[in-house]
UniProtKB/Swiss-Prot annotation:
It comes from the Bacteria. GO terms for cellular component: small ribosomal subunit. The gene is rpsD. Keywords: Ribonucleoprotein, Ribosomal protein, RNA-binding, rRNA-binding. This is Small ribosomal subunit protein uS4. One of the primary rRNA binding proteins, it binds directly to 16S rRNA where it nucleates assembly of the body of the 30S subunit. With S5 and S12 plays an important role in translational accuracy.
């Protein structure tokens, strides 16, 4: 399945969740495009599972093949499958660049990585799906520190999560540790995703 490239606000309204995690997309119209409000149609269990999967997949901007591979990797880890799945998504390089506030969206963060603006432990990494390990340092390359999009993103960046640290002067941050479930989006129902793939 191809990666969605349309307006994020429209997809957020269709899925009923803020994909940017800011809530702005749903502030005025918290219902699907084309509707005048929430309908009374009964939603099946399968539809709920599919919607949960699509919401998480689009939130992190991952195509179906990558999404399923990460899900399978999470199943090999000790602990709760659904939570481990979210932790692995959080450890993607593009997501951490977004968490640092270096880009306004995960899509923008992915472009920064793909265009070679980011290093991990001093080495340039241009693979957005690169899985960062706790303790690794992510930084903007010296020659990329004047990129306008980065400066603009930092001006409106929200506070960083406790599982990362970021130095705005040096434009570098550390993936301190894996997050705890309570630190991540509580609108995501990862157990429904586990059920979807267990059908």
């Amino acid at each position: 399945m191809a990666r969605y490239t349309g307006p994020a606000w429209k997809l957020s309204r269709r899925l009923g969740i803020s994909l940017s995690e800011t809530g702005k997309e749903l502030a005025k119209r918290p219902y699907a495009p084309g509707q005048h409000g929430n309908g009374r149609k009964k939603i099946s269990e399968y539809d709920l599972q599919l919607q949960a999967k699509q919401a998480l997949r689009h939130m992190y901007g991952v195509n179906e093949k990558q999404f399923r591979r990460i899900f399978n990797d999470a199943g090999k880890m000790p602990g709760i499958h659904g939570e481990n799945f979210m932790f692995l998504l959080e450890s993607r390089l593009d997501n951490l660049v977004y968490r640092f506030g270096l880009a306004r969206t995960r899509r923008g963060a992915r472009q920064l990585v793909n265009h070679g603006h980011i290093t991990v432990d001093g080495s340039r990494v241009d693979i957005a799906s690169y899985r960062v390990k706790p303790g690794q340092v992510i930084a903007v390359r010296e020659k990329s520190k004047n990129v306008k999009a980065i400066a603009e993103a930092l001006e409106v960046a929200p506070a960083t999560k406790d599982f990362v640290s970021f130095d705005a002067e040096k434009l570098e941050g550390t993936f301190v540790r894996l997050p705890e479930r309570a630190e991540l989006n509580d609108q995501i129902k990862e157990q429904l995703i586990v059920e979807y793939y267990s059908r």
